[in-house]
Amino acid sequence: MRRDSDKYTQFGLVRDMLAATAIVERFDAQQALDTAEAIASVGRLLMTGEGSSRIFPAKNAIAHARRRGWKLELHTEAARQSQEYDLDGWAVFALSNSGRTREVIELFSKLQQRGHEQLYSLTAFANSKLESLANKGYVLAC
C-alpha cells in the first residue's frame, strides 16, 4: 500500500493506521509505571471493554506477555460477560474510546460499589464517566 495514494488514504481507518507508528513512538511508558507495579503485585489482570476498543489491544498485550514469559495472568472478556465473574483478586483495566460504553460503566459501577480497588481505564476523552469510576484513568493524547 502506498502511503500517498488517495485510493487508500481517503479512508479514516487507513489514516489512523498510518499514524499509529508516530503515536507509539511518542508514548511515555513512565507515566504508567505505578499502575504496572500495582497490577504486577496483584498478578492477575482482566482487560475488558466492548468491540475494537478491547479486542486488538488486549489480545496484543496477551500475546506480547506470553512471548516474553511474563508471570502475569492475563485475560480479556467483554464487559457484559465480565459481570458474571468473581473478580476479587483481579486488577481490571477497561478500554473504551468514548469512556461512556454502557456495559463497561455497569461493570465498573458494580465493582466500585463492592469496594474493588484495582480499577483502571483508558479512554480517548478526559473526564469521562469511566475515568471517574476508575482508581486511575488514562486518556489518549494523540
Where are these regions (language model features)?
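Cofactor-/ligand-binding subdomain signature composed of acidic, glycine-rich
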Residues: 1-34, 39-40, 119
